[in-house]
Design a protein with these regions (language model features):
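Compositionally biased terminal segments of proteins
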Residues: 1-162
Length: 162
């Protein structure tokens, strides 16, 4: 819920770690309100802050859970309240791009600005959010997110979501 997300964001703020929201909460931050229920929070953290973020999670009673998709740069954390953080580690390249899991993305990808109630957050900007929803089998939450992003930010709805 929104209180849990705000608390997790506050942990990062207190630790002076810059985070970028992705996924459903990233969409809702761009919209400025919670548009649906979420089962986790997707967070990107720069490589230089990754270990500190993990230590902060552990200090707040989160533990790592192994999933079939976890890697060195993509870990999942849960606590006793069943709050789940989907944590992604990226780095900036010398060419000013974002490198994540071997793929490069334009620096503007992280230029989104949003809010979770009164907390201002950086997030994936709207067009990139829509593009990242392509090329896989999507569910009703994806349809909800893409349609809201396209309506709100005047982005053409991709064919597979029509």
């Amino acid at each position: 819920n929104i209180t849990d997300v705000k608390q997790i964001l506050q942990f990062a703020i207190d630790a002076e770690i810059k985070v970028f929201l992705d996924g459903g909460w990233g969409v809702d931050a761009l919209l400025g309100y919670q548009s649906r229920a979420h089962n986790d929070i997707d967070i990107f953290v720069e490589k230089k802050d990754y270990q500190n973020f993990i230590e902060m999670m552990k200090a707040n009673d989160f533990y790592e859970i192994k999933m079939e998709y976890t890697t060195l740069n993509h870990t999942v954390w849960e606590d006793a309240k069943n709050r789940i953080v989907d944590l992604h580690c990226f780095e900036y390249t010398g060419e000013g791009e974002i490198l994540y899991e071997g793929d490069c993305f334009p620096i503007e990808t992280f230029s989104g600005k949003g809010k979770i109630e009164e907390i201002e957050v950086s997030c994936i900007e709207p067009y990139s959010q829509v593009m990242f929803h392509l090329g896989y089998e999507f569910d009703e939450n994806d349809v909800h997110d893409v349609k809201l992003l396209c309506e709100t930010f005047h982005i053409e709805i991709p064919n597979e979501y029509r």
